[in-house]
């Protein structure tokens, strides 16, 4: 059992590294883009420093195997100077799996150091695995590995500041880690679209457009581990591609959408994917086939 737990910890660290260094170093327009002299927003293109990094990473990760043995210490140390904050939120939702009654859901939100209502931020919705909840990624206090990596990547100016949201992926009143129905993961798209995204955009400074959420899709990313990877593919790409442009699936659980269905959805969609980071270990007997 201890060996399995150690392997799980190592796998999560590798996934976090890939997620933070590869997924979000894309061409999402961020606060650092600022405005041009004529007042228009200036995006981050492939010719920019971040764009070139994203292009290089994309080329590297197209190789057959990519190995990361350890996260560099500069990214994992706890910052005491320029550190972001983690906020625990409760938001109104519905039991979309059962009777549709009103319920309250919870999530954790990472706000980067220097967060300001005068600046607009991109948002990453980061999903947990089948045995987890909103706390699985460790975003509960200052010792969070995700928080430490975010703080350091921002401090070293390797990424522009953005918001991270870790919700509970079960859209039902009984959303506990144990004893809940795993089928409730498959209806999370309704909660995501109707409740969570509107709450985040109403309470934090994002690129939201109250009348048309699709206008800000270039400023949203969805990613997840295991069951959360399934949700990213099934829900993020399959149901909410009008809301997201960036996706990451890490050892995704087998999806209910075969690859052919997903491919057809993309072909028929008027929306394009800006970046899709899909990773799985070759020895993962469950997730490898779905990758």
Which sequence ranges carry the predicted segments?
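Bacterial signal peptide processing site
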Residues: 32-34
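Positively charged n-region of N-terminal signal peptides that target proteins for export
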Residues: 2-14, 20
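C-terminal motif of bacterial Sec signal peptides marking the signal peptidase cleavage site
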Residues: 27-30
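A subset of signal/propeptide-processing and intrinsically disordered low-complexity segments
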Residues: 1, 36-37
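Accessible peptide chain termini
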Residues: 1-2, 291
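Non-catalytic cap/lid and distal C-terminal segments of serine-dependent acyl enzymes
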Residues: 37-291
């Amino acid at each position: 059992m201890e060996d399995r737990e150690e392997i799980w910890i190592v796998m999560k660290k590798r996934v976090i590294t890939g997620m933070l260094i590869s997924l979000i170093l894309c061409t999402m327009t961020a606060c650092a883009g600022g405005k041009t002299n004529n007042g228009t927003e200036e995006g981050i293109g492939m010719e920019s420093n971040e764009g070139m990094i994203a292009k290089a990473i994309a080329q590297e990760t197209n190789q057959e195997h990519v190995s990361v043995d350890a996260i560099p210490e500069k990214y994992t140390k706890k910052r005491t100077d320029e550190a972001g904050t983690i906020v625990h939120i409760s938001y109104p939702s519905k039991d979309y799996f059962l009777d549709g009654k009103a319920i309250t859901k919870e999530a954790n939100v990472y706000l980067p150091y220097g967060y300001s209502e005068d600046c607009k931020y991109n948002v990453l919705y980061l999903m947990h695995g089948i045995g987890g909840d909103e706390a699985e990624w460790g975003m509960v206090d200052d010792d969070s590995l995700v928080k430490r990596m975010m703080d350091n990547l921002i401090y070293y100016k390797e990424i522009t500041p953005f918001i991270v949201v870790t919700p509970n992926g079960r859209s039902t009143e009984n959303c506990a880690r144990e004893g809940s129905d795993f089928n409730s993961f498959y209806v999370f798209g309704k909660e995501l679209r109707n409740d969570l995204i509107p709450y985040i955009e109403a309470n934090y400074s994002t690129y939201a457009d109250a009348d048309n959420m699709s206008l800000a899709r270039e400023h949203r990313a969805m990613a997840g581990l295991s069951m959360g990877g399934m949700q990213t593919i099934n829900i993020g790409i399959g149901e909410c591609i009008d809301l997201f442009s960036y996706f990451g699936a890490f050892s995704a659980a087998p999806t209910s959408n075969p690859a052919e269905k997903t491919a057809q959805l993309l072909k028929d969609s008027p929306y394009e994917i800006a970046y899709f980071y899909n990773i799985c270990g070759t020895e993962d007997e469950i997730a490898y086939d779905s990758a």
